[in-house]
């Protein structure tokens, strides 16, 4: 069975209470449970990780290469300035799909640039929690060689 990793970055543990007008009322626990269920229907095992700390995210990305076949990553605000996370993604051979709940290109100007997207297999933004499922579908296609 394929194993995939879902990584959520800073402040995503506050889903459901933080800026519900932007991120919705769903919680991280709900998102993770829904994603695990969706992955299971595809015959895939999905493990979830969340951290507010850049180093912890870098560590899990490094470790992932030997354990998982791909990563779905929401780097949160690190998207816009973490060259260290960008370098961690670039240093591994498994595909990474970047996902964002909101459309970062329609928000404040400082959110428009993603320093991590260029080293990811793709980026999905603006579809709420459904974007994570789209990322899962895209990652599975990437792993099939599509």
From Swiss-Prot:
Catalytic residues in the record: 23 (proton acceptor), 100 (proton donor)
Keyword Transit peptide attributed: no
Chain residues that bind substrate: 74, 80, 87, 101-102, 111
UniProt KW Transmembrane helix keyword: no
Pathway per the UniProt entry: Metabolic intermediate biosynthesis; chorismate biosynthesis; chorismate from D-erythrose 4-phosphate and phosphoenolpyruvate: step 3/7
Site feature location: Transition state stabilizer: 18
Any one GO MF annotation of this record: 3-dehydroquinate dehydratase activity
Top EC category: lyase
GO biological process, alphabetically ordered: amino acid biosynthetic process; aromatic amino acid family biosynthetic process; chorismate biosynthetic process; quinate catabolic process
Domain of life according to the entry: Bacteria
Pfam families: DHquinase_II
EC number: 4.2.1.10
InterPro entries xrefs: DHquinase_II, DHquinase_II_CS, DHquinase_II_sf
Reactions listed under catalytic activity: 3-dehydroquinate = 3-dehydroshikimate + H2O
Protein keywords: Amino-acid biosynthesis, Aromatic amino acid biosynthesis, Lyase
Quaternary context: Homododecamer.
PANTHER family noted in UniProt: CATABOLIC 3-DEHYDROQUINASE (PTHR21272:SF3)
Family: Belongs to the type-II 3-dehydroquinase family.
Role this protein plays: Catalyzes a trans-dehydration via an enolate intermediate.
Protein name in UniProt: 3-dehydroquinate dehydratase
Organism: Bacillus cereus (strain G9842)
Gene: aroQ
